[in-house]
Every structure is written in structure tokens, then in C-alpha cells.
Amino acid sequence: MPTEAPPLVVHLVYRFDTGGLENGVVNLINHMPASAYRHAVVALTEVVPAFAARIRRDDVQYLSLHKPPGHGVKLYPRLLQLFRELQPAIVHTRNLAALECQVPAALAGVPVRIHGEHGRDAHDPDGSVRRYQWLRRAYRPFVHRYVALSRELAHYLEHRVGVPPQRIAQIYNGVDLTRFDRGSATRFAPPGCPFSDPALFVVGTVGRMQTVKAQPLLAQAFVRALQMQPALRERLRLVMVGDGPLRADAQAVLDAAGVRDLAWLPGERADVPDVMRGLDCFVLPSLAEGISNTILEAMACALPVLATAVGGNAELVVTAGKGQTGRLVPAGDVAALAAGLIAMSADAAAAVEMGRAGRERVERQFSLRSMVASYQSLYDRLLAERITTRQPA
């Protein structure tokens, strides 16, 4: 007698390409037992094959809808047909750009409809834009459960969008503690990086170079730190890994200051753990964040963190006391970021101790195993409730 196939989860995103949100989908699919759920990834715009190749399961279906800019109401008939063909047990949309897809999912009778809030963009860094609040309220009746990646986002959903707290699950991102590991107390430069001298203090960041990530601000802060303390030219170095529209801007800042040879901007790299192991301090200059995967990855690699005080960063980085893991500075404040770079580089021993505390913190609270178990438990529970009641949650 043939075995019944596991329930299907459709993960619906705007674009399936390099990014923290998308990497979370990859981790979820790769580490959730195949016997529990099948998966499909639907991108409103495009599934990028090179990124999709990170998924190790060969039974995952990928669909690109090539949506033009603007409201996606013209896609509703196609999505309605798609959901009826795929017959998913769960549709899981992520962030505002995909939220409207809850409407055709509801019309298709999808049993469980989940929406994840992973963070904000540069147009609404603090969640105060009323139009975005209104849009979320408009689609609220179509969503059974929300997943907020941080306590700050859960508070936003409850108090700005009006979602009852019992309909919000707060699940932190998790990090692969085996893949992201310091491995050695010694810093090793990744292939191609010119900063192998152990006497150097190497600061760096990893991420797509777009407005919300604000990498040019880090380049400006690096230049400012060297201007404030010229002796740092002998040992302070900058690594900025990633590609995107702001890469040229960041490089231009460094070139204009005459410090091109003190920085390395190699573009996008697949060997992110090796990049992390080539740093002494991880820096995240973002204007907005949910729960940053790269902060968690840096902490797993025993790196101290210098980040902006936005979104869920304060929930990750401990800034005082015995278990201090890093420092937080105001977003957009080049002077404060420069001061943070100087402070980190001035006390290498303290930086190492912060990194050690960070590794211990992610081991306790932010493991990938815990994240996957939380999502699987949510899927199981909601599906059981819907099968039992067949009533709106």
C-alpha cells in the first residue's frame, strides 16, 4: 500500500536570492526532516538558480512568477490556479512584499496560512510609516498565524497592526553551529584576502550592498577612524564582502580617501564561514534589521560585534556586563561607528573575550536545531488545529 506523501509547504517570497530571509528558508528546508513536510519555493519575481542550489533536497519545486513592480492583483488568478494545482497544506509568506498572496491562498482554501515578519527596509526603518501599517491591517483577516523574528517585531504587529498576541509566534533565527565555528584562536585570511599578517586588526561585514544595509557608512567610519588616529593605518584593515548597487559607492569612499590598499571588497563570496574566520571584529551598519543572520553567524565564529541599535540587534548583542558580546551605536552615525572601530581595535584581548561570550550565547539560545524545531512544531500544531476544526484560527 503506497505511503501518503507528507504535507506540502509553499514558501512564498519576493525574490529567492542571496539574503538573510532567503537563507532562513534554505536552512529550514535543508534541516527539517523530509518525512515531515515537502516544500516548494515560489518567488514573485525570480528564483535565482545559483542561490536555489544551496537547498540540498532534490524534491523541492521552484517557481518564478516574474511579477512587475506594483500591486500584484493581476497575479491573483495565476496564484489561485497554482495553489489549486499544488494543493499545499500550508502557505508561508514572508515580509510585506509577499503578504498580499495570502488573499489568493485564502480563496483557494489553503488550510493553514502563515506570514513571517523578518525585518524592515530603508523606506520604513522604524515601522512608523502608516501606509505600511494600513496594508498589513488590510491583509490581517487572511492570515491565520504570524511569525515575528524578534520581540520588537512582535510588539509592532500587536500594537501597530492590531494582531492579537495569541496569533503571533516569536521565533528567532538559528545558526549552523558546525558550519560557523572559529575553529582556531588564530585568524586565517580567506583565499584572495591580502590581510594575513597577525599583527593587523581586521574589521569587516558581509551582506548584500543595498540601501538598508548602509555599507558606505562603514567605509566612511573606517576613513574617519584613520583620520582620528593616523597610527591605525599601520594595523586597522577593512573587509566588505557582498555585491549590490552600493558596492561602487563604498569603494568610491575608500578611493577618495586614498585607503584602497587598506580595504578589500571582493564582491559576493560563497565561503562566508571562511570570511568570518578572517576577521577580528564583525560590523553591521544597517539602518534596519529584523534578527540578523550575519550577526548570529559572526557570534558563532566567536567574533565581537559592532552594530547599529536597530530592530532586533539589541536582542542579540549584549553590550554590558560579564557576558558582553559587542557594542551598539546609533544608526547613521558615522562618528559613533568610527569611535566603535577605534575602541574595538584598542583592546584586542577584550574583543576576543566578547567573541567567546558571543559563541556561548548562540550555543545557548540561537541554534539552528532550535529554530527548525520551533517552525516544525508551529506547522504541526496549526495543521492539526485546522484539520480538527476547519474554522478560521
Protein language model features and the residues they cover:
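Short hydrophobic beta-strand element within catalytic cores of glycosyltransferases
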Residues: A43, P304-A307, V317-V318
